[in-house]
């Protein structure tokens, strides 16, 4: 990770900044995913939040659903500030998240990515994730159905 970037687990005091990031990045996303109260509820349901910061500003975040009994983690949400898209910042956060697998004792990390999100799909490929397949037209985004790619990474 470049020295001007910091990656860390988000705390309750970061939830308002996380809400602000989601509001900037997701104009057409479900309202609840933009809400600090909803994020707080997710924390109580064994979700962890990670962020990439530059000069104290949250630029990229990921929400992980941890399932320790089944030894897996799912990246359920990944967002980049609109002004910082295309700079490959997600690469560093995914790298850090892979390192969290050992902390939680997880063997598999998986996620679904919009098929048209080329940069994020490339990021997961670069990190050794395997493309398990594409779920065709299975997600409503804005006012249209979109396909989702399913990626997984198994700890060796």
What are these regions (language model features)?
Residues 4-18:
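A short beta-loop-alpha structural element at the N-terminal edge
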Residues 110-112, 128-147:
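Conserved catalytic-core motifs of GNAT/GCN5-like acyltransferases
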